[in-house]
C-alpha cells in the first residue's frame, strides 16, 4: 500500500476567502493537524486516525482533514488513512503545558468512595459515547463563537493537582462568569446528551457533525433536551457551580474524532 507524504497546509497559506473553513494548524498533543486530503471536485474522502473517523471539510477547492491529537500523544511521525487505500504522514510536535494546583473543600471529589467510583464509571461510559459519536453530515467550518462572555480562568492542557494529588490534565477551557449567566450554542448542532454527573455537574453535549462535539459543564440549569436541534446563539443553559468546582464557571470542551482539543484553536 502506497505511503504518501502530503504537505500540511498552514492557515496562513490558504486563500483569504477560505480562512474560516479550517481551524488553526496546531500539530501537537491536544491540538489539531490540518491535512490536505485531495481536490474538492472529488467526493468527500473517508479518513481515519487511530481507527476513528476524522472530520473532513471543504476549504476552497481542497478537502482538509481536521485531526484531533490526544493529549498523551508522543512527538514523532503519525499518519492518517485516506479512503482505506493510502497513508498520509504528519509530524506531531512537542508542546509543554503548565501546572495548576487547586484546593477542593469537598473531599469526595478528590477521593471518591466505592459507590461514587461506580457512578463515575457509569457516567464516563455515557459521556464517552456522546463525545465519540459520528454523524455523517457536511461540516462547512469549525469556527465557533464564545459560548459565554467572561475571563478565561483555566486554559486547556493544564497538568492538574487537586489538594496536591495529581489528576488528569484539564481537557477544556474554563470561563469564569456569574452564576445564572446564559450560555449560548457556539454553532449549529444537535443535543447529543444531557445529565447531572459526579465530576462535571449539570452538563450539555452538542454534536456539530462528523465527530465535532462540544461539552458544557457545571451548569446551574439545563435549558435543552436530548435530540433538540440548535442554531448558533440559542441558549442551552446557564453558568453554575455544580460538580467538582471551586466557584461558578463554564467548563467548555471541544472534541474531534473522540479526542479533546484546545477550544482556543476553534474560537473566532
Question: Predicted regions span which residues?
Answer:
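Positively charged n-region of N-terminal signal peptides that target proteins for export
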Residues: 1-5
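Bacterial N-terminal signal peptides
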Residues: 7-17
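Generic marker of residues within folded, mature protein domains
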Residues: 11-13, 25-27, 37, 46, ...
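Intrinsically disordered, low-complexity segments enriched in proline/serine/threonine
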Residues: 17, 29-31, 149, 265
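Cationic-aromatic interfacial patches
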Residues: 20-90, 94-96
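Surface-exposed, glycine-biased beta-strand/turn segments
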Residues: 21, 89-200
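A short local loop/turn or secondary-structure capping micro-motif enriched for an aromatic residue
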Residues: 55, 64, 74, 96-99, ...
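Catalytic cores of peptidoglycan-degrading enzymes
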Residues: 145-268
Amino acid at each position: 500500500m502506497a505511503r504518501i507524504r502530503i504537505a500540511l497546509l498552514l492557515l496562513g497559506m490558504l486563500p483569504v476567502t477560505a480562512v474560516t473553513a479550517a481551524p488553526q494548524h496546531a500539530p501537537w498533543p491536544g491540538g489539531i493537524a490540518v491535512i490536505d486530503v485531495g481536490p474538492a471536485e472529488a467526493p468527500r474522502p473517508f479518513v481515519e486516525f487511530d481507527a476513528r473517523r476524522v472530520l473532513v471539510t471543504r476549504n476552497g477547492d481542497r478537502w482538509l482533514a481536521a485531526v484531533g491529537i490526544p493529549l498523551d500523544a508522543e512527538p514523532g511521525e503519525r499518519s492518517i488513512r485516506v479512503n482505506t487505500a493510502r497513508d498520509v504522514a504528519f509530524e506531531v510536535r512537542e508542546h509543554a503545558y503548565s501546572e495548576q494546583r487547586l484546593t477542593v473543600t469537598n473531599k469526595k471529589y478528590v477521593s471518591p468512595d466505592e459507590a461514587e467510583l461506580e457512578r463515575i464509571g457509569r457516567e464516563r461510559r455515557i459521556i464517552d459515547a456522546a463525545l465519540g459519536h459520528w454523524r455523517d453530515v457536511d461540516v462547512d467550518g469549525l469556527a465557533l463563537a464564545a459560548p459565554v462572555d467572561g475571563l478565561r480562568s483555566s486554559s486547556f492542557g493544564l497538568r492538574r493537582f487537586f489538594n496536591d494529588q495529581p489528576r488528569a490534565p484539564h481537557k477544556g477551557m474554563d470561563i469564569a462568569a456569574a452564576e445564572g449567566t446564559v450560555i449560548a450554542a457556539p454553532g449549529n448542532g444537535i443535543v447529543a446528551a444531557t445529565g447531572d454527573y459526579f465530576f462535571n455537574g449539570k452538563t450539555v453535549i452538542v454534536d456539530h457533525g462528523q465527530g465535532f462535539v462540544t461539552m458544557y459543564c457545571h451548569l446551574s440549569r439545563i435549558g435543552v433536551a436530548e435530540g433538540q436541534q440548535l442554531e448558533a446563539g440559542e441558549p442551552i443553559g446557564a453558568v453554575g457551580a455544580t460538580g467538582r468546582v471551586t466557584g461558578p464557571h463554564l467548563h467548555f470542551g471541544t472534541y474531534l474524532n473522540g479526542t479533546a482539543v484546545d477550544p482556543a484553536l476553534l474560537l473566532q
